Amino acid sequence: MLLNKKNSPIILIGFMGTGKSTIGEYLSLEKQLSFIDLDVYIEIKENKTIPEIFEEVGEIGFRKIEYNYLTECTKKYDVIATGGGVIEYTESLNYLKQYKYIFWLDCDIDVIFKRVTNDKHRPNAIDKSKKQLNNLYLSRISRYNEIAFMKVNSDKTIREIYNEIINYLTCG
């Protein structure tokens, strides 16, 4: 199964640290699809890190920038790993609703906390307790659920997650 530009891209959503970038890259390599990590794309285009952008324009300013690049990437790439907060901006949330293959990667907050603690590239995780991260996570669940084609537990191996996604794409 190879996607072409006429097909809907595979879009990975979910909280920070759930494996969107890792799974997106693996999926693209296995299926010879084009892939982009939206945060990396933003950093390249803006010539700044995500934390620098947050510092300069705040979260709302960042979400507007993110939306502009999201609309660009959905037209250019087969597989897109979004930032965890892409659903926080109403325009991005509504834009994503038009796409069919949105996979919500999710895992236990303890796993997430271990993965993101002290990660300086995640401005919403810096100096946050597990309780604070959990509150942010809980505030986003309904939006992830609203647009997800399928929820995938990412507490598994990369290959198991990949197989589950491919199964949904080919059989579901």
Swiss-Prot record:
A Gene Ontology term for the protein's cellular component: cytosol
Q: GO terms for molecular function, please?
A: ATP binding; magnesium ion binding; shikimate kinase activity
- Binding locations of Mg(2+): 21
Domain of life of the native organism = Bacteria
What's the Enzyme Commission number for this chain?
A: 2.7.1.71
- Which enzyme class, named as a word? transferase
What cofactor(s) does the depicted protein rely on?
Mg(2+)
Q: Which GO terms describe its biological process?
A: amino acid biosynthetic process; aromatic amino acid family biosynthetic process; chorismate biosynthetic process
* Textual note on the cofactor: Binds 1 Mg(2+) ion per subunit.
Its function?
A: Catalyzes the specific phosphorylation of the 3-hydroxyl group of shikimic acid using ATP as a cosubstrate.
Query: Any idea what this protein is called?
Result: Shikimate kinase
Give the organism the record lists.
Staphylococcus haemolyticus (strain JCSC1435)
Gene this protein is translated from: aroK
